[in-house]
């Protein structure tokens, strides 16, 4: 049990180090560039401006006002797309680093139970949570599962601590995979 605890602590430490490495790479390739700074400031400004306009608009607002809001939403969407494209080059570098590091660490922890889950994962996640482990106890956790969970959560928190995460206003306006969709349809 003590080796399992030591492995878990080591994996959390590895996740912190790889998240810091990823943010360092992103800072070098993206965050310090003038283009990124300009686009980020523009997105922030547009998000706040659009939020204010949406708060003041009424149901009986004129067609002209609704058109202005639609144009601003389109402009914001384009700037968000440009911002994503600027960040894309660092994503390739980070993906390459993470893949290389994950392969190396996966070979070190191959076949070792690194943690015990307090639940049985859903069947479609069991392939990841129980990867390269012997036995049928699906509460056993493999390196890859713990590493991915730790890296995802730690990296987000590091971005917030360093002030590099997108603002709530920009995230809210952009929609995104898990966020609410943009409310452009409300004015149609």
Swiss-Prot record:
Q: Which residues form the signal peptide?
A: none
Q: Which residues lie within the membrane without crossing it?
A: 121-130
Query: Where does the UniProt entry say this protein principally localizes?
Result: endoplasmic reticulum
Gene Ontology CC terms, in alphabetical order: cytoplasm; endoplasmic reticulum; endoplasmic reticulum membrane; Golgi membrane; multi-pass translocon complex
What InterPro entries does the entry give?
EMC3/TMCO1, TMCO1
The residues that cross the membrane are: 5-32, 87-106, 141-162
Q: Topology in the membrane?
A: Multi-pass membrane protein
| Membrane side Lumenal: residue ranges | 1-4, 107-120, 131-140
Keywords for the protein's UniProt record, in alphabetical order: Calcium, Calcium channel, Calcium transport, Coiled coil, Endoplasmic reticulum, Golgi apparatus, Ion channel, Ion transport, Membrane, Transmembrane, Transmembrane helix, Transport
Named from the GO MF annotations, one term is:
ribosome binding
One GO biological process this protein is involved in is: multi-pass transmembrane protein insertion into ER membrane
Stretches of the chain found on the membrane's Cytoplasmic side: 33-86, 163-188
Q: Which residues form a coiled coil?
A: 32-89
Q: What does this protein do?
A: Calcium-selective channel required to prevent calcium stores from overfilling, thereby playing a key role in calcium homeostasis. In response to endoplasmic reticulum (ER) overloading, assembles into a homotetramer, forming a functional calcium-selective channel, regulating the calcium content in endoplasmic reticulum store. Component of the multi-pass translocon (MPT) complex that mediates insertion of multi-pass membrane proteins into the lipid bilayer of membranes.
**Family (UniProt):** Belongs to the TMCO1 family.
Q: How does it assemble?
A: Homodimer and homotetramer. Component of the multi-pass translocon (MPT) complex.
Q: What is this protein called?
A: Calcium load-activated calcium channel
Ranked from the top, the taxonomy reads: Eukaryota, Metazoa, Chordata, Craniata, Vertebrata
């Amino acid at each position: 049990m003590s080796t399992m605890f030591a492995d878990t602590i080591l994996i959390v430490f590895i996740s912190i180090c790889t998240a810091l490495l990823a943010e360092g790479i992103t800072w070098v390739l993206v965050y310090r560039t003038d283009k990124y700074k300009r686009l980020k400031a523009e997105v922030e400004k547009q998000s706040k401006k659009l939020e204010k306009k949406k708060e003041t608009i009424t149901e009986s607002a004129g067609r002209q006002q609704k058109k202005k809001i639609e144009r601003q939403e389109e402009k914001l969407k384009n700037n968000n797309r440009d911002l994503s494209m600027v960040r894309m080059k660092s994503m390739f570098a980070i993906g390459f680093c993470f893949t290389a590091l994950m392969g190396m660490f996966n070979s070190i922890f191959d076949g070792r139970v690194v943690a015990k889950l307090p639940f049985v994962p859903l069947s479609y996640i069991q392939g990841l949570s129980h990867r390269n482990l012997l036995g049928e106890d699906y509460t056993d956790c493999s390196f890859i599962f713990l590493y991915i969970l730790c890296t995802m959560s730690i990296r987000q928190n590091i971005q917030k601590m360093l002030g590099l995460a997108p603002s709530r206003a920009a995230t809210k306006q952009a929609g995104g995979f898990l966020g609410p969709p943009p409310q452009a349809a409300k004015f149609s």
